[in-house]
């Protein structure tokens, strides 16, 4: 993304963390609750023009038992925190790709269930409603990318490329950048 936007003109700070959730505590992995980490991140990266949020896949884990609507409540909390900590920043909310149909089966990720797949497919609708209510930009990642056949959860390089291009186009639209 830095390369496409032009080094020097734009600076991208990536804060992805494997296992991060919106509001849930992972009893086996510390510091995965996004709402607890966000205030420090906002302070670290003050004066961001645009903050992109793509969370929710890990919230679909069976241990949390969360519905898409409950995950949406976590997203609403995150958006509120951004509004409070970075009031001048624009926000792009991205609903994550769907989990693959077999992600919960033996040989894949036992932290997910069949219900997890269904919940992941409902996130875009919930997130779109939040984006409309909050008057923020929205992108449905599942419209552009899908999980790899290898693990049914993460994107392969081609799907990363497809999603990156969609995000790039959305950033251009939001920021009014002329190519």
Where would I find each of the regions flagged by the language model?
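Structural motif
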Residues: 22-33
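A short, Lys/Arg-enriched amphipathic alpha-helix followed by its capping loop at the start of a domain
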Residues: 1-8
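Alpha-helical cap/lid subdomain in secreted, periplasmic
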Residues: 32-179
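A short beta-strand-loop structural module common to alpha/beta enzyme folds
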Residues: 8-23
């Amino acid at each position: 993304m830095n390369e496409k936007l032009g080094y020097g003109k734009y600076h991208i700070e990536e804060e992805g963390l494997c296992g991060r959730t919106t509001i849930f505590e992972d009893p086996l992995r510390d510091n995965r609750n996004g709402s607890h980490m966000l205030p420090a991140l906002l302070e670290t990266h003050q004066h961001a023009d645009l903050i992109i949020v793509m969370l929710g896949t890990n919230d679909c884990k069976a241990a949390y038992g969360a519905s898409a609507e409950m995950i949406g409540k976590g997203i609403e909390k995150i958006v509120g925190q951004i509004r409070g900590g970075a009031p001048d920043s624009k926000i792009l909310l991205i609903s994550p790709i769907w989990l693959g149909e077999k992600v919960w089966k033996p040989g894949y990720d036992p932290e997910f269930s069949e219900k997890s797949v269904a919940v992941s497919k409902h996130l875009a609708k919930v997130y779109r409603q939040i984006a409309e209510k909050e008057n923020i930009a929205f992108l449905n990642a599942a419209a552009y990318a899908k999980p790899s056949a290898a693990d049914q959860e993460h994107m392969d390089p081609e799907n990363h490329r497809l999603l990156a291009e969609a995000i790039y186009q959305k950033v251009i639209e939001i920021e009014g950048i002329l190519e």
